[in-house]
Amino acid sequence: MNIFDHYRQRYEAAKDEEFTLQEFLTTCRQDRSAYANAAERLLMAIGEPVMVDTAQEPRLSRLFSNRVIARYPAFEEFYGMEDAIEQIVSYLKHAAQGLEEKKQILYLLGPVGGGKSSLAERLKSLMQLVPIYVLSANGERSPVNDHPFCLFNPQEDAQILEKEYGIPRRYLGTIMSPWAAKRLHEFGGDITKFRVVKVWPSILQQIAIAKTEPGDENNQDISALVGKVDIRKLEHYAQNDPDAYGYSGALCRANQGIMEFVEMFKAPIKVLHPLLTATQEGNYNGTEGISALPFNGIILAHSNESEWVTFRNNKNNEAFLDRVYIVKVPYCLRISEEIKIYEKLLNHSELTHAPCAPGTLETLSRFSILSRLKEPENSSIYSKMRVYDGESLKDTDPKAKSYQEYRDYAGVDEGMNGLSTRFAFKILSRVFNFDHVEVAANPVHLFYVLEQQIEREQFPQEQAERYLEFLKGYLIPKYAEFIGKEIQTAYLESYSEYGQNIFDRYVTYADFWIQDQEYRDPDTGQLFDRESLNAELEKIEKPAGISNPKDFRNEIVNFVLRARANNSGRNPNWTSYEKLRTVIEKKMFSNTEELLPVISFNAKTSTDEQKKHDDFVDRMMEKGYTRKQVRLLCEWYLRVRKSS
């Protein structure tokens, strides 16, 4: 199918369909969605969740306490927002059941650039997936999306409708709009003259989906929400005639759907008054002497915390506060999820194919999240950040607390302050374009750009110092460690084999040392007494600064003996035990004399050296670095290593 046929097919599928009232009622018998409220239809569009048993994944089990959590495919690109999405779905479920939430404003509260607008756009987009049914008369559709049920009286007609068509009583009770009341009068009470149109909600055409934004005190009045008289029609109709009214307000257009109020609490208070009755009673008054207008939809509002705090602290606004269902949308606090956000943003730009050195997105993610976290008590903020990503630090940081302990101490407002994703993405844009020749990103340029930007933003001194401390105290040393490993592993061709040899030798020496036995090397025949074994073990332990060798050796040997039982008597992989892996890596790379000629970009004295250097660069490029980045990062690493 070519693009033109595909487009036509889509256009035809979205066309309105007209029914008689009798046909509509017959449809109601088979299809609940014909009379479902806005929250029910939105739930249908969201679809069923994928249930994830976090007990099966160690990382998730630490974050979600082994709970079974729901993940919704409709929100799969909203990373790290499980709690907010679950609260939105909970609101919709309760509203769909006709509970108190049906009468409340769904209010997304969060910091700038935290994803509130994106969530609102997704909800509006989902609302387009399920059609609505609207009254029509003489070929004209109701301007306020009157549902056909507005024609029926709950007291008089509910029993018959329930008996004949299976329509529950609670779906009746929506008032008739002045437009529908006038047509009913013209038809002499004959409701069969009405038609019912199946319409697809549309953001573009503002059908059942509307958006309103705050203006200033002088130029915004309630007509933005409720509409006003259309002056052009006064030539033909009286001022209080329903046909003289322009139903252009957001509440008029959003009936049976969703109305988004952007930065709601920036609007003048007088503009918000119609929302009180629209939510609580399902109707509101227009600006002229016409009867009340119906509203049976969702009001979705969002704003930043500062506006909410100002509004909440004003005693005159108590009536509003009781009608608001708050969903907090904080910044993402998990490194792995923040990285996915950056990747998503990059994929929607020209930079999607630009080289990005390993560790760049991780480093920026760490910086952003450190800025959002509250300082913990008696623990490092860097450890807290790692715990928030689901890591277990019991072997590496004895002071680290559990995820829940950190959360409890931080309180409910954690993640509502700090650097936004927008700020981070602007930084990333500058990093990719830092080099005038090569469009690529690497952490060294990232450090430079971040330091510059912290100065330019003119943060309060204490905050700026805190951000610089994150850079110089945590991120730069950690990255130096990371790039050191990258360089060293690329340098050692038989890295894995060499590491395994040291591991096996260490375990053998430690085992004989613990048993206080001599050991004879089967390859060389050399005999090691307990003192010699201790000396050999210390050669491996000292570069890593092991403070209690006796306990460490016992711990390693016990681990290996247990592992052998499940591994056909063979030693486990040398990387399987984090503590010893770190010790071996430090031992392997403690001697840099051989390393320097290979990784430096100076002129080489022999073809052998040149070949080793070229092989090293090739292996680094296989890891995801460009040739230019290999040079930059090696030179930076050597400078940092020398200065430390």
Swiss-Prot record:
Q: Which reaction does it catalyse?
A: L-seryl-[protein] + ATP = O-phospho-L-seryl-[protein] + ADP + H(+); L-threonyl-[protein] + ATP = O-phospho-L-threonyl-[protein] + ADP + H(+)
Q: What happens when the gene is disrupted?
A: The deletion mutant displays an overall compromised ability to survive sustained periods of nitrogen starvation. It displays higher metabolic activity than the wild-type strain following sustained nitrogen starvation. Absence of the gene leads to increased expression of the toxin-antitoxin systems mqsR/mqsA and dinJ/yafQ. Inactivation of the gene leads to shortening the lag phase of growth during transition from glucose to malate as the main carbon source. It also affects phosphorylation of several proteins during glucose to malate shift, including AceA.
Known outcome of mutating R232A = Loss of activity. Cannot complement the deletion mutant
Give GO terms for biological process.
cellular response to nitrogen starvation
GO MF term set: protein kinase activity
What are the entry keywords?
Answer: Cytoplasm, Kinase, Stress response, Transferase
Tell me any Pfam family this protein matches.
Answer: AAA_PrkA
Q: What EC number(s) is this enzyme filed under?
A: 2.7.11.1
* Gene3D superfamilies (alphabetical): P-loop containing nucleotide triphosphate hydrolases
Q: How is its activity regulated?
A: Autokinase and casein kinase activities are enhanced in the presence of Mn(2+). Mg(2+) and Ca(2+) are 2- to 3-fold less efficient than Mn(2+) in stimulating the autokinase activity.
Primary role = Kinase that plays a role in the adaptation to sustained nitrogen starvation. May act by indirectly repressing the transcription of the two toxin/antitoxin modules mqsR/mqsA and dinJ/yafQ, which positively impacts the expression of rpoS, the master regulator of the general bacterial stress response. In vitro, can phosphorylate the isocitrate lyase AceA only in the presence of malate, suggesting that it may play a role during glucose to malate shift. Displays autokinase and casein kinase activities in vitro. It can also phosphorylate specifically a 65 kDa unidentified cytoplasmic protein.
Per UniProt, subunit arrangement is:
Monomer.
Q: Which family does it belong to?
A: Belongs to the PrkA family.
**Official protein name in the record:** Serine/threonine kinase YeaG
Tell me which species this is from: Escherichia coli (strain K12)
Taxonomically, what lineage is the organism?
Answer: Bacteria, Pseudomonadati, Pseudomonadota, Gammaproteobacteria, Enterobacterales
What gene is behind this protein? yeaG
